[in-house]
Regions:
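N-terminal binding-site loop/beta-alpha segment at the start of enzyme catalytic domains
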Residues: 2-129, 168, 199, 205
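Twin-arginine (Tat) signal peptide motif
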Residues: 6-15, 367-370, 428-434
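Beta/alpha (TIM)-barrel catalytic core signal, keyed to glycine-rich beta->alpha loops juxtaposed to Asp/Glu
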Residues: 44-46, 178-384, 388-409, 436, ...
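Structural preference for beta-strand elements that scaffold enzyme active sites
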Residues: 59-63, 101, 128-132, 169-172, ...
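Short, acidic/polar
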Residues: 80-94, 150-164, 220-227, 302-305
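Active-site groove signature of glycoside hydrolases
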Residues: 163-185
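Immediate flanking context of iron-sulfur cluster ligation sites
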Residues: 351-366, 414-432
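Short Fe-S-cluster ligation motifs
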Residues: 394-428, 460-466
């Protein structure tokens, strides 16, 4: 099945959809005047948070993705730790402004997210928030565990999540990142062959899991199987949806138009991940920024992506990994309340997406699933710097171009500032430990080799000599 499988949602159908979504929003739209000033200071939302009641729970349309908590240097001098004080501040602010859905997983923040999230949330009444976490046994499977050994390690992961999150039940629980790796074979090995699917279903019957779902990336056969043949009555499904992936999904991913439509026709609520593609849709090419700003000068670039994701009525919540307070405040303004896209705005974003695919960025969402690299390479930082230079027009291509010297200098200086030399692409040995964990299907060693070759050409000024 290709990425365009399934019926397309037409312009007329989308207008009907967002018209229905608009019924659930009320009050004024946007932030107060402070947020509109040229100083970029973001103010308080003018209205109340938009909520969806698709699972029986009153869930905030903006959900907190806990994959990108702020980090700080470890006082012991080894690596980084979560900045717990800042996490507490972000969580307190989010709860005070209507966010009640918090999504985490055992691998997030290099294994530190669940504990940090649990510490922050446990300071508040348990009935004031919903916790979502995951059975993330893909790395256990990738490490070679099978059968009973995989089951025991998976059960331990599940039990540890209760401890770290300081709770005795999960509101939402997911089988994590189904569809990646070896597709159907890996899904069967992770869920059925080791018996963990039966174990989790019994946990739901016992009440320790309130709602059960799965998150999907990759092989569409896995997605279709889980909906059509698994026999599990899914309460929700988490998919990657944004205005670029709607019809232009890259790598191993499937067009979001198909994924959403399949869930909607089965009345299975969708939880949205990567509405901003790990920040890529807020750091688009300057030409795209100008296009968006001409349309709505007072809206942030990111708000377009969040309005798109929230405008579909079968969306339960839209997750955002808000590392900084200004991101949290901006997104709160977008969803307090949501102003659904109009028909013309939907078409405008699709035209924008058509334009964006012309810029050949690497589809890295900075999820850090590829980290840590055993050889110390900062993979996300390398890929993000490369994309940043493309989006800012600082990509030196031709030595005869009048902007070549300026772009060359910007790329090389920025590379050394963004990535310490011992962590740059030149140190990649091609072990490929990283690629199987990438939900975007990036061939990371190939990209490291390509970027390293490109950097060496720039350093030796070879392009200018062509």
């Amino acid at each position: 099945m290709d990425k365009e499988n399934g019926k397309s949602i037409s312009r007329r159908d989308f207008f009907k959809i967002v018209g229905a979504a608009g019924v659930v929003t009320a009050g004024l739209v946007g932030c107060n005047e402070q947020s509109k000033s040229s100083s970029n200071v973001i103010g308080e939302p003018d209205g109340d948070m938009t909520y969806r009641i698709l699972t029986g729970d009153r869930v905030s349309l903006l959900g907190y993705g806990c994959m990108r908590w702020p980090m700080m240097s470890n006082p012991d001098g080894e690596g980084q730790i979560v900045d717990q004080e800042e996490v507490n501040r972000l969580v307190d602010y989010a709860l005070a402004h209507g966010i009640n859905y918090f999504d985490t997983a055992p691998p997030y923040c290099q294994g530190l997210s669940e504990e940090a999230t649990g510490i922050a949330l446990s300071r508040h009444p348990r009935d004031s928030y919903f916790i979502a976490t995951k059975m993330s046994n893909h790395r256990l499977y990738g490490a070679g565990l099978r059968g009973k050994e995989l089951q025991e390690a998976s059960v331990k992961m599940y039990q540890d999540s209760f401890k770290y999150l300081r709770t005795d039940y999960f509101d939402y629980y997911l089988f994590h990142i189904l569809g990646t790796g070896k597709g159907m074979e890996e899904m069967r090995g992770r869920l059925y062959d080791c018996g963990i699917a039966d174990f989790i279903l019994k946990e739901k019957e016992a009440g320790r899991i309130r709602k059960l779902g799965f998150s999907f990336h990759g092989d569409v056969r896995v997605f279709d199987y889980m909906l059509q043949e698994s026999g599990i009555p899914w309460d929700f499904v988490q998919i990657q949806l944004n205005y670029l992936d709607w019809r232009h999904a890259s790598g191993i991913n499937v067009n979001a138009e198909y994924l959403y439509s399949e869930l909607a026709k089965r009345n299975i609520p969708a939880v949205i991940m990567e509405p901003l593609l790990g920040g890529r849709l807020s750091k688009v090419h300057d030409h795209i920024v100008n296009k968006l700003k001409q349309r709505e000068p007072e809206q942030s670039v990111a708000s377009w992506a969040f309005r798109f994701a929230g405008s579909f009525p079968n969306v339960l919540t839209v997750l955002s990994g808000m590392t900084y307070m200004e991101h949290l405040q901006d997104n709160l303004c977008t969803y307090s309340p949501l102003h659904p896209l109009s028909d013309d705005e939907f078409v405008f974003l699709q035209e924008t997406a058509d334009l964006m695919v012309q810029y050949q960025t690497i589809p890295c969402n900075d999820c850090k699933y590829c980290m840590p690299c055993p050889y110390g390479i900062d993979i996300p930082a390398i890929l993000l710097h490369y994309n940043k230079c493309i989006n800012e027009g600082n990509m030196p291509r031709d030595g005869h171009d009048e902007n070549y010297h300026k772009a060359r200098q910007a790329f090389l200086i920025g590379y050394d500032r963004s990535v310490p030399r011992l962590r740059q692409a030149s140190h990649c040995i091609g072990c490929n430990q990283c690629s199987p964990d990438c939900p975007q299907g990036i061939n990371i060693p190939k990209e490291m080799q390509r970027i390293d070759h490109f950097v060496e050409q720039l350093k030796q000024n070879l392009m200018h000599k062509l």
